[in-house]
């Protein structure tokens, strides 16, 4: 398991505006295929805890966002 910022296929962080506890980030992070335990908004990006090792996190190699 790992922690990190959730990214989309372009390598950009999932953006959020409500810092701290955030339903959107928590839902995205805890989806079955991502395997996260918890998600919240930190620095205007969705930060996830306990992600599956296979889930990509920011920064992605060769992607500038």
Curated annotation (Swiss-Prot):
Disulfide bonds join 12-65, 16-41, 25-46, 29-48. PROSITE patterns: LCN_CSAB. GO terms for molecular function: sodium channel inhibitor activity; toxin activity. Keywords: Disulfide bond, Secreted, Toxin. InterPro entries: LCN-type_CS_alpha_beta_dom, Scorpion_toxin-like, Scorpion_toxin-like_sf, Scorpion_toxinL, Scorpion_toxinL/defensin. Expressed by the venom gland. Negative results: does not modify the currents of the human voltage-gated sodium channels Nav1.1/SCN1A, Nav1.2/SCN2A, Nav1.3/SCN3A, Nav 1.4/SCN4A, Nav1.5/SCN5A, Nav1.6/SCN8A and Nav1.7/SCN9A. This is Toxin Cbo5.
